[in-house]
Amino acid sequence: MSTTEPSPENDRDPQPTTISTPTSTNAKLLKKIPAIPFRHSDKEGEDEQAKTDEVTTELAGEGPMSHDSPEILAPSSLGLNHIRTKSSPAPSPLRFSSATPLISPGQDDKDVAKEKPRVGVVDARADARARWPIPPHQPDQGKKVQWSQSKSQRVPANSNPGVESTHVGLAKETQSPRFQAILRVTSGRKKKAHDIKSFSHELNSKGVRPFPVWRSRAVGHMEEIMAAIRTKFDKQKEDVDADLGVFAGYLVTTLESTPESNKELRVGLEDLLVEARQCATMPASEFWLKCEGIVQKLDDKRQELPMGGLKQAHNRLLFILTRCNRLVQFRKESGYVEEHILGMHQLSDLGVYPEQMVEISRQQDLLREKEIQKINEKQNLAGKQDDQNSNSGADGVEVNTARSTDSTSSNFRMSSWKKLPSAAEKNRSLNNTPKAKGESKIQPKVYGDENAENLHSPSGQPASADRSALWGFWADHQCVTYDNSMICRICEVEIPVVHVEEHSRICTIADRCDLKGINVNLRLERVAESLEKILESWTPKSSVTPRAVADSARLSNSSRQEDLDEISQRCSDDMLDCVPRSQNTFSLDELNILNEMSMTNGTKDSSAGSLTPPSPATPRNSQVDLLLSGRKTISELENYQQINKLLDIARSVANVNVCGYSSLDFMIEQLDELKYVIQDRKADALVVETFGRRIEKLLQEKYIELCGLIDDEKVDSSNAMPDEESSADEDTVRSLRASPLNPRAKDRTSIEDFEIIKPISRGAFGRVFLAKKRATGDLFAIKVLKKADMIRKNAVESILAERNILISVRNPFVVRFFYSFTCRENLYLVMEYLNGGDLFSLLRNLGCLDEDMARIYIAEVVLALEYLHSVNIIHRDLKPDNLLINQDGHIKLTDFGLSKVGLINSTDDLSGESSLGNSGFFAEDGSKAQHSQGKDSRKKHAVVGTPDYLAPEILLGMGHGKTADWWSVGVILFEVLVGIPPFNAETPQQIFENIINRDIPWPNVPEEISYEAHDLINKLLTENPVQRLGATGAGEVKQHHFFKDINWDTLARQKAMFVPSAEPQDTSYFMSRYIWNPEDENVHGGSDFDDLTDTCSSSSFNTQEEDGDECGSLAEFGNGPNLAVKYSFSNFSFKNLSQLASINYDLVLKNAKESVEASNQSAPRPET
């Protein structure tokens, strides 16, 4: 086997040089592949194997190598795979390799036979691996790019010296620990017997382990989900029956000790005894239908009672029954029962209950639909042209994962309250008519900025002259040259800083064309369609005349907008059919807005009239519209013929469907033409280079697929061949498929892309780690969630909801989200790392805060909730742990979507410490013993969490809306000022009673808290959600006199009172509410870092495709029905392009600011 060592190459694109095939027939298959050189000066790399050795020993779990170890043996001489460190692009035999052919042309069968004895020395496992050489790894890869650093963008083509070693030396090296580590990491897929059934979700680093009882729910299948919920309800009903038996015994004992003269108490206790007996003897199917009504009536009676033993008995009975009622409510919130009930709390006070309201609900729905239809018809007649011009914009998509309800259009039944609304509240509710609601529903939602709608209309499009000025902003204001470069956070390729803006837009379009899960031909077609639309919108420079320019200037904005609408429609709908548009919307603020933000601290309107700083990635227009809006200037940096040539190459490669050697020859010719197109580009990192590299990657993928198909046919027809030749063909097929060149494995984001630094915190559903992206050096916080835990806790939909919300939101007070991906056992969410810790940790250190500091924090929470509620998102899990502090000292909300499932799972926690004894009132001896064992089991597996911050309507299992968040704000404000939550107690049952009884230990006023703070907390903690402050929106909260000194317009830009002084990688500000005990992690199969390394190792991830992210059939793990549906996480992986582009902009703005400051400091001061 003839091999040559790779030359030290540029750190941007290290490339392999050779591959060998075992037969002369295969030698005709591959030809010499030309290189695509860069246009800058040559620079040779240094220390080519230093980083590779570090990563190898780290992945293999061994310590650092000794400095006096023997001379490094190049793994390429042993036929090993490339070690995927993800700090540089994976190697390609088809890219930039004109200096060395894929196979030595003069090599024949004899040469192959001579080389076989050398390969035989290696372990048998090496025969199954691909024979690609390991490219050099530059030491500066994976580090942040310094702005003063000039990087070469050209790959040298120097000759590579061969590796000379004897058979004895080779045998000695194969026994070294370092070689064994490399062998373990780079070993390919191993064959396994077909008769062995593998449950990959049951495996961890230590082998097979059993999970606790699985509770199955299938995502997206209504029947299975309903059956799973009912199964859990039936099991919960058994526990409730046992608790009711104990409660009935308590009532009998109380009745015996109550004197006959106290008739009122005796009658009340007897009624509760009858109610408890009826509930306990009621079948589960009947109780499922009547549970909500029973809880509703009991709560109405409870509110009429004075404090005393009878009210306490009602509290205890409600505490028991709401465990089942919350499951019923969870089923309604999941969208499987559509009950439109409009009365909320006032109707239950009048004696009107769900069975009486169905007809009223239907009539109201019909009236509301008629009103909305009339409004739609009027608006269609009045503004038909404007509606057409705004169709192509990236309209915000309402996120309705957490259902929003209000006083007149609720899908849920809320708890009743004794107090009727005051006159002011009635006036407020009268103004909230169905017509007004219909108008608000049909308004287009644009995240973060309602004024962004203007950008979709012709009036919102800047003129050509304005575009030219805008496109020149970065170069004019920063004066950057090609000497300054940075790594693009989208494609992780080095680009000139001067072209960051244009490249970010172009790179996003190219990345979206290359969606995962679609065959390569379709992706090439999408690339071709994008290029075709770009060509249709641009005028070739050679045909531009003064008359043509004048005619172009006179084009109507409406006709231009129609063209852009068509482009947006094809690029947004056709290219993104696999992922919702709201999850892929990429847009960048117009440069004048960015200029205003950076130079004059400009602001933008939020949903309720307040002004907050614009987000760098607030969706406004589609990315194709924004790209084409500057085409007059971009055409000076691009070439029409080159783009047209890229289009022809993409189409021609996509149309290659014949499996044969002629197709491979044709693709090599196309690659040669592609090389010259990219080489002759007029500017770096723009359309020609960015789309050219994307086409090149797709061409590689299709080339490898065709090679695999050809070799598959040869292997199938080689039964009559000698064993040696047949085995060689098998190795060739394996080489093509298992090679790290496989683009589908290379392009997927994985945990290997990140270097795990340290754990940050632990929550009820997962753990958070501090990590660094190897390619860029950026710090992120990675939330790690076990698939098995998510399924067992019925949290699959919850984590998907959190992911979707994080993708959709754009607000300075909400944490930013960048990636989501999976491996065999874990789910990963990658978010921005905020080194200031959280509010809970701050309170643990300081005890409590003064009012001025608390006022700022609560005001920022109010702005965050104002934004979330404007896009129909209810947080429902607000607590100090979920309020993070960024490096500037401002608040950011996190942990979305977990409150709903977290509430259901916390049912066991809310069961309290009441003992069941040995005698139940309704239960028999067998069921008593079984229930006692079940309670012990629940204590062991109880879900961590606290109900301190939950609103009473959530605890009672009733419907709830946005006002539930305002209740939590009141609890947080009390804790921030006093030091403890207002309803804190030793047991969950006592906390439950304190909340529904509104038992608040008020501090002295005004000695300990001010009158304004007391009044705000009192109004936020109002039992009736309709009368609670914030019921009509965040405006009334912001107008409270507690916030009289707050400037809402500039709050996000004000300097915070507490600014973290920690280093970027410091996690000392985080103090987890839950005890971190690594010794307990053996239940889950190892330590914290085992989840990130062993279970998601290099070899397992390379062979794990997106469609294979499943947890297998759950029929064998649940007590529910026999499900044939698999839990699939195939759509979980996501790359948030808009937020990654915002990092590019943040870096450029930061560099511009530092340059201005440096110039100001160096400028001579005028003499006075």
Curated annotation (Swiss-Prot):
PROSITE patterns: AGC_KINASE_CTER, PROTEIN_KINASE_DOM, PROTEIN_KINASE_ST. Its EC number is 2.7.11.1. SUPFAM superfamilies: Protein kinase-like (PK-like). Residues 1044-1144 form the AGC-kinase C-terminal domain. The keyword Membrane does not apply. Residues 146-163, 401-414 have a biased composition (Polar residues). ATP binds at residues 760-768, 783. Disulfide bonds: none annotated. It catalyses: L-seryl-[protein] + ATP = O-phospho-L-seryl-[protein] + ADP + H(+); L-threonyl-[protein] + ATP = O-phospho-L-threonyl-[protein] + ADP + H(+). Keywords: ATP-binding, Growth regulation, Kinase, Metal-binding, Nucleotide-binding, Phosphoprotein, Serine/threonine-protein kinase, Transferase, Zinc, Zinc-finger. One of its GO terms (molecular function) is zinc ion binding. Disruption phenotype: Reduced root hair length. Coiled coil: none annotated. Residues 754-1043 form the Protein kinase domain. A zinc finger (C2H2-type) spans 488-507. One of its GO terms (biological process) is unidimensional cell growth. Residues 16-25 have a biased composition (Low complexity). It is an enzyme of class 2 (transferase). Residues 39-54, 107-130 have a biased composition (Basic and acidic residues). Highly expressed in roots, elongating root hair cells and pollen grains. It comes from the Eukaryota. Residues 1-165, 377-444, 546-566, 602-622, 717-744 are annotated as: Disordered. Modulates root tip growth. May play a common role in the tip growth of plant cells. This is Probable serine/threonine protein kinase IRE. It comes from Arabidopsis thaliana (Mouse-ear cress). The gene is IRE.
